[in-house]
Amino acid sequence: MCELKVHVDTPRGEERVAEDVVYAQVETEHVLLKDVLGATYRVSDSFISTIDIGKESLSLTQSSIVTPFLRFLEACQKVETTRNYTEVEESWSDLKAKGDEIARSLWKKYGRSS
């Protein structure tokens, strides 16, 4: 069996979050991980960026925009069956607001390049 070491790339750098992981699932607010002993780990605001079986590693990327993006994607998929567009509009508004917040923060930190 192949067990994976899991790292997360954050704005602060790379951190190891789990070892001997045999299960990973992207959920709306986190990535759920389970190791060979059944212990569970949740990494918030993240998605799976790389799986490298040869190196027995799984990499996650963490950002505050991931959850609003996944909520928007989920709403878009759900509207096909529910025919309720309201949730799409609300989640799109939330995603744009989070994107604006991140862009403003980066602009304050680095300014505009000429």
Named regions from a protein language model:
Residues M1-E15:
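Eukaryotic proteins' extreme N-terminal regulatory segments
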Residues P11-A18, E89-S91:
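Short low-complexity stretches enriched in small and charged residues
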Residues R112-S114:
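Long, compositionally biased, intrinsically disordered regions
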Residues E15-L73:
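Compact, glycine-rich, soluble single-domain proteins
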